[in-house]
Amino acid sequence: MATAPVKKKKKVNVTQDGIVHIKATFNNIAVTITDVTGNTVSWSTAGKNGFKGSKKNTPYASQVTAESAAKEAYDLGMRKVDVRIKGPGSGRDAAIRSLQNAGLEVKTISDITPLPHNGCRPPKRRRV
């Protein structure tokens, strides 16, 4: 029986500066760390870290997600980051705090959540 070919991990040349993109929706959180030109260095989501269902949108899930992405980028040599947050989800602050605890120096924090100029009609209010 033939064995599957072993995939080599792509070697990434990382500078010390980078950008952390945090996308916090109502259902999930995704953290992507790129270099200044936009090439992905590491990424992580709440589902990738073992959270399922409604637990994916908790501050603890965002903390674990940001820590795992930051640890991988730190091991590759990244030290200073700019943070860009998008979305209304909970755990935005916890993600930034865990980036700092992982050893990355946060230079700037900017909120790039897209705001409609009276665009689409929002979903109706829930009645539970």
Swiss-Prot record:
MF terms in GO: rRNA binding; structural constituent of ribosome
Purpose of the protein: Located on the platform of the 30S subunit, it bridges several disparate RNA helices of the 16S rRNA. Forms part of the Shine-Dalgarno cleft in the 70S ribosome.
Keywords: Ribonucleoprotein, Ribosomal protein, RNA-binding, rRNA-binding
Descriptive protein name: Small ribosomal subunit protein uS11
Family named by the database record: Belongs to the universal ribosomal protein uS11 family.
Cystines in this chain: none
Gene Ontology BP term (one): translation
UniProt source species: Chloroherpeton thalassium (strain ATCC 35110 / GB-78)
A GO cellular component entry from the record: ribosome
PROSITE patterns for this protein: RIBOSOMAL_S11
NCBIfam families per record: PRK05309.1, uS11_bact
InterPro entries given in the database record: Ribosomal_uS11, Ribosomal_uS11_bac-type, Ribosomal_uS11_CS, Ribosomal_uS11_sf
Record's subunit section: Part of the 30S ribosomal subunit. Interacts with proteins S7 and S18. Binds to IF-3.
Record has Repeat as a keyword: no
